[in-house]
Amino acid sequence: MKVFALAPNENWICDRFCNEWNQFSNGEYTENIHEADIIWLLGAWAWRAVPLDYLSKKKVVATIHHITPSKFTKESLREFLSRDRYVDAYHVPCQQTSDFISKITNKDIYVIPFWVNQNIWAPTPEKDAAKNREKYNLPTEAFLVGSFQRDTEG
């Protein structure tokens, strides 16, 4: 079975997810949508880039990364429902997104966190951690968690 993962080509995390999927999926991917059994809308907002005849004839999985309920407008709902006609199942990374979209679709929803590419994300070596704590005046006993992202929410 071959999966075509749609990269939105925005130089963002979804493009990296597509590249990593293609690199590490053990040959279960195709970069040719004609050969695909499944179309994975990894950047679901870019779904209109796929010809409707492909969306109609193939299995379609859409990833919904997050929804901010206060920003989910009537137009957002119309767009969701337009895409929903072609989607067979949804992938979401968290329960909150599943809870939200379960109210507007009857399609299967799979809650699966994203993977971590250990080739680019790894623990900081102790000597570097100590230097950073000193440089940024962080307590040596504290457990620190960092988030590094380009955020669409500002």
What is the predicted function of each stretch?
Residues 1-49:
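N-terminal pre-catalytic "stem/leader" segment of glycosyltransferase-like enzymes
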Residues 26-28, 60, 77, 132, ...:
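Catalytic phosphate/metal-binding cores of nucleic-acid and nucleotide-processing enzymes, i.e., regions
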